């Protein structure tokens, strides 16, 4: 797979590469994220990890769990590196996420963390877990795609592998 680039006007901080492998990703939502000053500084330094992150809905509010933002040593009032963080979404989006989680057995997973117009945003996707045979099929598709790209590259350069 080609490396994902940041979209125009966005600065990519982190992305969850495992989410696409472990889940079938569905609808995506862009959410603001409530942060402390030290968390924003560490995000600007690129010190964040989205692996194993997920969202829960509690009393009409969405919280992001499992995101690791490194602690800042020089911060007077630091933050909890893996604490729950509140997400800012419209009410209809929250209701849709809540229904999908409760009725359809889906999971809300964080896929990308980025700055947009100076504000920290997180992209969450409604996801359904893949079975192990689905994961094996994904690996086969990726290998086939990688081989096709190699043939095209070597064929164009004249190595005689075409």
Curated annotation (Swiss-Prot):
Keywords: Cytoplasm, RNA-binding. Required for rescue of stalled ribosomes mediated by trans-translation. Binds to transfer-messenger RNA (tmRNA), required for stable association of tmRNA with ribosomes. tmRNA and SmpB together mimic tRNA shape, replacing the anticodon stem-loop with SmpB. tmRNA is encoded by the ssrA gene; the 2 termini fold to resemble tRNA(Ala) and it encodes a 'tag peptide', a short internal open reading frame. During trans-translation Ala-aminoacylated tmRNA acts like a tRNA, entering the A-site of stalled ribosomes, displacing the stalled mRNA. InterPro entries: SmpB, SsrA-bd_prot. The gene is smpB. One of its GO terms (molecular function) is RNA binding. SUPFAM superfamilies: Small protein B (SmpB). Belongs to the SmpB family. It is found in: Cytoplasm. The keyword Cytoplasm applies. This is SsrA-binding protein.
């Amino acid at each position: 797979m080609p490396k994902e680039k940041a979209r125009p006007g966005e600065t990519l901080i982190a992305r969850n590469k495992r989410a696409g492998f472990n889940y079938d990703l569905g609808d995506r939502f862009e959410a603001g994220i409530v942060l402390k000053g030290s968390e924003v500084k560490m995000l600007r330094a690129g010190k964040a990890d989205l692996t194993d992150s997920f969202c829960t809905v509690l009393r009409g509010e969405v919280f992001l769990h499992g995101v690791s933002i490194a602690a800042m040593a020089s911060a007077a009032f630091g933050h909890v590196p893996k604490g729950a963080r509140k997400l800012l979404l419209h009410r209809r989006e929250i209701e849709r996420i809540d229904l999908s989680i409760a009725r359809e057995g889906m999971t809300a997973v964080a896929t990308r963390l980025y700055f947009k117009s100076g504000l920290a945003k997180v992209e969450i996707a409604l996801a359904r877990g893949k079975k192990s045979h689905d994961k094996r099929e994904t690996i086969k598709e990726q290998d086939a795609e990688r081989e096709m790209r190699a043939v095209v590259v070597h064929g164009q350069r004249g190595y005689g592998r075409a």
